């Protein structure tokens, strides 16, 4: 049986975007994120972070610094009862033309393979058009967060639409 997941961008989705964040003290999850992640966990979704982190390729911070910043975010989410199950990141600069920087799909394909995911049962949540394009290319449903649509709102949509699709699998919107 294939598994379902919510893939989620990091910056401006789970936490404010601190450009090239290299200090864990600068990492602060949005207030609604820990409880919202827990709701996804409780509903049986894996929660996988997929994030472009070109600061590594630009030499602004190291892999160790990125890991420390991500560990701080995960600690804050865990303190609120939520769990990020895995992190996939692209360390390359845009001009490197790699195959993992969103909207290219390598990070998503790695997640699908590693966890045996069914993309039709998965969601991508992010704040940029490239996040939405990434999810669409993988065959996932998508939710774009913004100043008007919080991560908690996105989770409301996912849980509501998942319940609807279980009752009527042919009634499926792709983007919210």
What residue spans do the PLM features occupy?
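Active-site neighborhood of HAD-like aspartate-dependent phosphohydrolases
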Residues: 1-48
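Asp-based, Mg2+/Mn2+-dependent phosphohydrolase catalytic module
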Residues: 2, 6, 64-85, 93-124, ...
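Broad hydrophobic/π-residue packing in well-ordered secondary structure
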Residues: 7-8, 25-29, 45, 61, ...
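Metal-dependent phosphoesterase signature
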Residues: 11-31, 56-65, 80-82, 92-99
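Ser/Thr-centric signal marking residues that sit
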Residues: 13, 51, 142
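Substrate-recognition element of Asp-dependent hydrolases with the DxDx(T/V) motif
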Residues: 33, 37-70, 86-93, 135
């Amino acid at each position: 049986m294939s598994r379902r997941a919510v893939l989620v961008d990091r910056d401006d989705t789970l936490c404010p975007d601190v450009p090239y964040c290299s200090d864990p003290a600068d990492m602060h999850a949005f207030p609604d994120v820990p409880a919202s992640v827990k709701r996804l966990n409780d509903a049986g979704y894996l929660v996988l972070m997929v994030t472009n982190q070109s600061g590594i390729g630009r030499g602004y911070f190291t892999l160790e610094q990125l890991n420390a910043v991500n560990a701080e975010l995960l600690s804050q989410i865990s303190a609120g009862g939520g769990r990020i199950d895995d992190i996939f990141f692209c360390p390359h600069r845009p001009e490197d033309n790699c195959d993992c920087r969103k909207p290219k799909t390598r990070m998503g394909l790695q997640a699908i393979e590693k966890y045996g995911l069914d993309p039709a049962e998965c969601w991508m949540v992010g704040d940029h058009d490239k996040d939405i394009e990434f999810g669409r290319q993988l065959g996932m449903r998508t939710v774009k967060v913004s100043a008007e649509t919080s991560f908690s709102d996105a989770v409301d949509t996912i849980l509501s639409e998942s319940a609807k699709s279980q009752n009527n699998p042919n009634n499926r919107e792709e983007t919210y």
